[in-house]
Amino acid sequence: MQKLLLALIVGLGGFLGASLRYLISIFAAKNFGGNFPYGTLIANILGALLIGFIMEFSMDSALISSNMKLFLTTGIMGGLTTFSTFSYETISMLTNGNITLGIENIILNLGCSLLFVVIGQKLARILF
């Protein structure tokens, strides 16, 4: 029964994260256009920032239970961030001759995601 409950916790978080990613993609396409996958980039950066913060905060705090951590990280962040979409969009750009955009997409997604994990960790240390 415990494993089923944990699966439901992750599933609910995944639903919320994926829904948030969808809303971010709609917002980004409307506001920034469709020439570059800004929605995926924003979702990946936001997810990196939040997972860095949550993981750092949870190491030194009893305020986040193991179930809440599972819900937030594996669930919401797992549904929000998307390596498969990033990969597909990058390959599509490269195979369609948009080499510069493809390379920019790789650099921005990887560079910003790594940077924002560190920023999230530092924010957690500063705030808590």
Swiss-Prot record:
InterPro entries with a match to the protein in the record: FluC (IPR003691), Multihaem_cyt_sf (IPR036280)
GO molecular function annotation: fluoride channel activity; metal ion binding
Gene coding for it: fluC
Positions of Na(+) binding: 78, 81
A Gene Ontology BP annotation from the UniProt entry: cellular detoxification of fluoride
TM segment ranges: 4-24, 39-59, 71-91, 99-119
Major site of localization recorded for this protein: membrane
Gene Ontology annotations for the cellular component aspect, listed alphabetically: plasma membrane
Location of the protein in the cell: Cell membrane
Tree of life domain: Bacteria
Function comment: Fluoride-specific ion channel. Important for reducing fluoride concentration in the cell, thus reducing its toxicity.
Catalytic activity reported: fluoride(in) = fluoride(out)
Keywords from the named record: Cell membrane, Ion channel, Ion transport, Membrane, Metal-binding, Sodium, Transmembrane, Transmembrane helix, Transport
Protein name: Fluoride-specific ion channel FluC
Family membership: Belongs to the fluoride channel Fluc/FEX (TC 1.A.43) family.
Activity regulation field: Na(+) is not transported, but it plays an essential structural role and its presence is essential for fluoride channel function.
Membrane-related topology note: Multi-pass membrane protein
